[in-house]
């Protein structure tokens, strides 16, 4: 992607429909694209939690669902699937250091945490054999750091001498970087059995190309990559602005654990239809700042989750 020379011209669209709400939305879809239909399994039960789960614990979890005759369709593996807490990433006070990109060490990662997943190939074979769709979390802002298993191959592909141990900055607007990112980093995980990604971008809002929003463009690149390979696109992502209804499942977290938060979610979900956004995935049960767990709050949240677009527990 690159900037185009712009003259003093601006396109302005006026929509006048009175009470013709459905007609307005239909015409907006002609302009901004149709809502992509997610695969059938996305309307089943998702399980996720921010915790250091091992492969054995996740297998036991799946068996617990079956023992109690509760369906489970999607297993979301949060960021601890990769290296997060190496000793050299902390100072003497136990404070986390920054990496070469200026981000927190361990926030971005592509190297399996073998203490939790000693046999990732075997684990993903097991999930596939048990008809569990697997999604993994990505925080890509730190680029490819020197400790990663893929660093030497990736740095070489980008024209960086691996001996320098210089990280490869993340630049999704660079076609060469984007292609190598898919081919060298992500596609091998998908061949192992990862079904789709939780693209958890939460850093800067601009790119090297003026006017290009990184959240929006990431959603586009991830979706078009699968489309080009003849794979039905599916992405679980953060909202990047108008037009993101083309990229299926939205992540609304990180939700506070409180009654007002639950009270707001039905309104928030319903009004998203005003911009054709139909598939929010909420942190059912909440995620942040618990003031003590309230069993009734959790029960009511589960009830709402059953009627929300995507039923993903997270508490």
Q: In which residue ranges do the predicted regions lie?
A:
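Catalytic-domain carbohydrate-binding cleft regions of carbohydrate-active enzymes
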Residues: 1-315
């Amino acid at each position: 992607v690159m900037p185009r020379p712009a003259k003093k011209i601006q396109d302005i669209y006026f929509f006048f429909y009175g009470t013709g709400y459905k007609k307005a939305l239909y015409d907006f879809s002609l302009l901004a694209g149709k809502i992509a239909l997610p695969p059938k399994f996305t309307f089943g039960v998702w399980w996720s939690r921010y915790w250091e789960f091992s492969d054995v614990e996740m297998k036991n979890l799946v068996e617990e669902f079956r023992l109690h005759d509760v369906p489970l369709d999607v297993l979301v593996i949060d960021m601890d699937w990769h290296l997060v807490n190496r000793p050299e990433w902390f100072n003497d006070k136990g404070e986390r250091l920054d990496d070469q990109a200026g981000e927190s060490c361990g926030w971005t990662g592509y190297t399996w945490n073998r203490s939790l997943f000693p046999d990732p190939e075997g684990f993903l074979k097991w999930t596939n054999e048990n008809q569990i769709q697997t999604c993994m979390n990505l925080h890509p802002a730190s680029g490819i750091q020197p400790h990663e298993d893929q660093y030497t191959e990736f740095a070489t592909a980008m024209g960086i001498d691996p001996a320098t141990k210089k990280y490869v900055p993340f630049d999704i607007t660079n076609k060469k970087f984007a292609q190598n990112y898919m081919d060298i980093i992500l596609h091998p995980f998908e061949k192992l059995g990862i079904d789709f990604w939780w693209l958890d971008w939460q850093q800067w809002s601009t790119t090297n190309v003026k006017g290009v929003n990184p959240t929006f463009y990431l959603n586009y690149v991830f979706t078009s990559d699968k489309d080009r390979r003849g794979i039905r696109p599916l992405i679980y992502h953060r909202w990047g602005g108008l037009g993101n209804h083309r990229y299926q499942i939205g992540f609304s977290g990180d939700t506070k654990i409180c009654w007002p938060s639950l009270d707001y979610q039905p309104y928030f979900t319903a009004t998203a239809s005003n911009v054709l956004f139909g598939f929010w995935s909420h942190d059912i049960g909440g995620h942040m700042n618990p003031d003590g767990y309230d069993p009734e709050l959790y029960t009511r949240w589960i009830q709402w989750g059953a009627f929300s677009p995507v039923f993903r527990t997270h508490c």
